Amino acid sequence: MKIPAASRQDEVLITRGAPDNEARAIQRRAKAGELTRIAEGVYLAERDPETQKAIVRRNWIRILAVLVPGAVISHRSAYQGGLSADGGSIYLSHPTNYNRKIDLPGVRAVLVKGPGPMAGDTRFGNENFYFASRPRQLLENLSAARGPRGKSAGAKAVEDRLVSILNASGENELNNIRDTARELAKSMGLRQEFKKLDGMIGA
């Protein structure tokens, strides 16, 4: 059954940043067994494991913005547009909070070392949580990847995306991407990746 939008506001309860009385009330409900704690400060008003997965997948941005403030959806996840349909890992770049995983019902966040939000990255509403810009995505996905499901989508995926951009927006857009990527590469330490990207665009 589809949950009405009004009801969904209460399916995830977060104590971080909440007024003290609200946070204490949530903690009391959890202690009484009314709520399920899925991460520090994050609770669900649901016990069924499959329903928990569905709730987390509906609210993953809000949840991860609390657990990893300042993170950027990056690499393969940015290339794919966010959370994959098969429930795979989502890669988040963060300058200080990295080399760890956060396992939630239905979602695994993989934190990798990388810059926080940069010029061109998109912020999700009022959340301290971001989505990598297209030039940043292309650079990151040319970085070394380990295994078929590593953090980077790889050169073939980048080539395919460049062809799509060319067909949709023309050469000027590719040149704009190259100019922006050139500057980003300097601050991100991805000069070799930019050389690859430059060669692809120039080919």
Features from the language model and the residues they span:
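Hydrophobic alpha-helical interaction segments
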Residues: 16, 24, 116-203
